[in-house]
Amino acid sequence: MPMWAGGVGSPRRGMAPASTDDLFARKLRQPARPPLTPHTFEPRPVRGPLLRSGSDAGEARPPTPASPRARAHSHEEASRPAATSTRLFTDPLALLGLPAEEPEPAFPPVLEPRWFAHYDVQSLLFDWAPRSQGMGSHSEASSGTLASAEDQAASSDLLHGAPGFVCELGGEGELGLGGPASPPVPPALPNAAVSILEEPQNRTSAYSLEHADLGAGYYRKYFYGKEHQNFFGMDESLGPVAVSLRREEKEGSGGGTLHSYRVIVRTTQLRTLRGTISEDALPPGPPRGLSPRKLLEHVAPQLSPSCLRLGSASPKVPRTLLTLDEQVLSFQRKVGILYCRAGQGSEEEMYNNQEAGPAFMQFLTLLGDVVRLKGFESYRAQLDTKTDSTGTHSLYTTYQDHEIMFHVSTMLPYTPNNQQQLLRKRHIGNDIVTIVFQEPGSKPFCPTTIRSHFQHVFLVVRAHTPCTPHTTYRVAVSRTQDTPAFGPALPAGGGPFAANADFRAFLLAKALNGEQAAGHARQFHAMATRTRQQYLQDLATNEVTTTSLDSASRFGLPSLGGRRRAAPRGPGAELQAAGSLVWGVRAAPGARVAAGAQASGPEGIEVPCLLGISAEALVLVAPRDGRVVFNCACRDVLAWTFSEQQLDLYHGRGEAITLRFDGSPGQAVGEVVARLQLVSRGCETRELALPRDGQGRLGFEVDAEGFVTHVERFTFAETAGLRPGARLLRVCGQTLPSLRPEAAAQLLRSAPKVCVTVLPPDESGRPRRSFSELYTLSLQEPSRRGAPDPVQDEVQGVTLLPTTKQLLHLCLQDGGSPPGPGDLAEERTEFLHSQNSLSPRSSLSDEAPVLPNTTPDLLLATTAKPSVPSADSETPLTQDRPGSPSGSEDKGNPAPELRASFLPRTLSLRNSISRIMSEAGSGTLEDEWQAISEIASTCNTILESLSREGQPIPESGDPKGTPKSDAEPEPGNLSEKVSHLESMLRKLQEDLQKEKADRAALEEEVRSLRHNNRRLQAESESAATRLLLASKQLGSPTADLA
């Protein structure tokens, strides 16, 4: 059951029935007896360092007076809130002891100004609410989810549950929109790893780093070292604030310049407003730009302009702002490691292990490198590198640009007479993440055995069959209740993991993500807020001038006044911003129910979210707990279906989400559709109702992926507009990925009237695929990792002669081809033209964000090498279908005709034919021309395959894997690459036609020569006969004539 606040299964809090004289009602509403408060030896703080969130989605709850850190020496429990609000007596459900009906979730508010383009996710969550009395807002800190009783009581042979802690034993998945889901596969990012929205955030490793505020480098990238203005002050409601402004300009179409403003607003909350607003979205101003006051009145109307003063020109100011913004960024981490022998389980037993056993040493060797501390110059994590007072050696490693120093219990100094081993606990007890290594036979670990307020995450690792070639490990995780979940997700049962580099990467990523996630806990959130407030107060007090915001307006913002300003881009120009534009929506998974039916279950729950769409990504952020609940790249958007206040968005493999909008009907939906047309390659779907004919047939065929492979002529399907290459997204109201192929086939066979949502093919008739699908197809091509295979002997029943196969082999692999574009860059499939030639892209001006070419080559990824032909088995080329001479293609198993179709490289076809003919001296002229005819048939097969279906074409790669020279020209984008392929195919057809014409001319010339030869031979014989007769008549000897 999903853990959304206000959803089904979420108890209503903060409401209490009004007082009444009804004894039955009073008895029914009598609260449970409060638990007894035991004595504790710990001092009771005024505000506990670790306060839990108040709902499944991080809803704020009044702080409990008791410390939630329940350890072995303190058994106190969190008390109930002292006061609750009232509920009306007329609520009948309350009288029966049933939960009250939850109100419909409200649409989250969107920050003004409307067209401010946010740089990252945390900027979307920036709040102008006045600062709280304590150190930071509770809702901002409580990004973790409240653990249920089942999570706290979950136990295994590795880990025991405890109050105040969440246990992860494996199989939990990633919590997203609609509940837990399987972890995403590359190139998709986990929700917790999404940070920057304005720029592409590529997944470079199998395990992503999560909960990192990568947008903290915004000031360093766009302000530091560049001309800008800083303003500091003390706002009455917000406290100390720091504002940075910079005006940017870039070339526009027609030679003009386009201006925008980059803005950073910092308050005492840890979230910072970062982003850009176009000058077209602002009121008209002078050529040198708006004044800082006018700009802030529009961007930050909640900020009091009178409190701001211009920052000083001291070099300390930008350095302090860098430190302030990047305090959350750290690439040096320390992790503790405790050693638990067989039969052990308590803290004292683990700290008092003097020497490491063989299994522990095997684990340490896998995890990192043992380094000598004395003289060690890298990150030392508070260890002594001069006098060896903290041990002589330690464990050190690097992972994804992070330095990690491990505090290993057996490598730290051992004190014989100290049972608590304070010299060891002084380091490990201050580590946020602790790895507990268990030998086989260890007792289950319980987090309450560790007495520390800093250790928030425990990674329990147990070895199985250690010190053998078959060593494996299992992993369990225990985290404090206010620490949000983090990845990588554990497999079911926590393993097993083989002792290899993949397990090392998994464990290191888990440790880094755990420490980053623990930063959202109350204790560390309060510490970071105090530090931030001190920096802001210092800037507002000591680093300001007497120049007010009004006085600074006459200086203007930096601009090159000599350039001509571009003409306004008209309505909708603000939609072309590279950053993320925001709308308030209610989102739900896209499993559509029948009209009039009531949605139920996890997929029927609507979650209030902020919808952010940038030039690179689309995200849904739950503002209540500050989590990204859904994300996808804009290149993965397939299509959308919209009405006045609802939009169904299809992405990836055809999955769908439903978004509902507030406000004027059609306004927000129109803005979102216009934005999607600019930043994605998707299009609008079509809804078709397809009746059956008299024989009960629908008149079309689809494959397992939902692509229409054949539409019969003069059927209802053809009349409705269904065409080959279209893609079914919904069948009878259900998304295709949510249906098994058998279930989808049953619906198509049995439904009286089939209603389908169709994604039409592109303008060339090719089916549309998302980038993730293309990436997955590239990973599924085993031939890309090996040597190229020989050409198959048959293509559609045509037997190739040896000279023909030699020609194809030379065209494919000959390294002596003349110079030209790179080998791999020339091989392109026409079906990928659908990813680049959509009509909505034509409306995008030059200033619109363009997807950078930072991803693997899609065309190479979908081009497979030929496979080795099997001598004893052959795959049928096509499957028979009614009314068609050729069958539909199986997408899961590409037809051999595609695997045997090859595109020649830069080697000229005419030169190849001439060279082969010169070498094939034993063959007759007719055999040589027959070989050329077979080549023409093969090339026609290629063209027919491309025009009939958009399947990936087998890649004819270089067997030697020779890298492409940088000096060789290469098409710049997909459209150029596809155009290059089309021109190459046209040239191939022209060469074939010319060769046929040359053959016909040559045959005609041969026939003429033979005719002339026979005529000359006859004339010669006739002349010889006449000469013989003449010589006889003259008396000449015949021997001379003979």
Swiss-Prot record:
Entry keyword set: Coiled coil, Cytoplasm, GTPase activation, Membrane, Nucleus, Phosphoprotein
Biased composition (Polar residues): 134-146
Biased composition (Low complexity): 832-845
Residue numbers spanned by region Disordered: 1-87, 132-153, 830-903, 946-980
Residue ranges annotated for the Rap-GAP domain, each copy included: 321-539
Expressed in which tissues: Expressed in fetal as well as in adult tissues. Expressed abundantly in the lymphoid tissues such as thymus, spleen and peripheral blood lymphocytes and also shows a significant expression in the spinal cord.
Pfam families assigned: PDZ (PF00595), Rap-GAP_dimer (PF21022), Rap_GAP (PF02145)
Modified residues (Phosphoserine): S67, S182, S304, S314, S817, S839, S912
PTM sites of type Phosphothreonine: T64
Gene Ontology biological-process entries: adaptive immune response; cellular response to water deprivation; cytoskeleton organization; intracellular signal transduction; negative regulation of cell adhesion; negative regulation of cell cycle; negative regulation of cell growth; regulation of small GTPase mediated signal transduction
Gene3D superfamilies hit by this protein: 2.30.42.10, 6.10.140.210, Rap/Ran-GAP
Signal sequence interval, chain numbering: none
Keyword set includes Cytoplasm: yes
Basic and acidic residues bias locations: 957-967
Topology in membrane: Peripheral membrane protein
Cell location: Nucleus; Cytoplasm, Perinuclear region; Endomembrane system
UniProt feature coiled coil, ranges: 972-1034
TM segment ranges: none
Induction behaviour: Repressed by 12-O-tetradecanoylphorbol-13-acetate (TPA) in promyelocytic HL-60 cells.
GO cellular component, one term: cytosol
Subunit structure: Interacts with RRP1B; the interaction leads to inhibition of SIPA1 GTPase activity.
This protein's name: Signal-induced proliferation-associated protein 1
Source species: Homo sapiens (Human)
Classification lineage: Eukaryota, Metazoa, Chordata, Craniata, Vertebrata
Gene: SIPA1
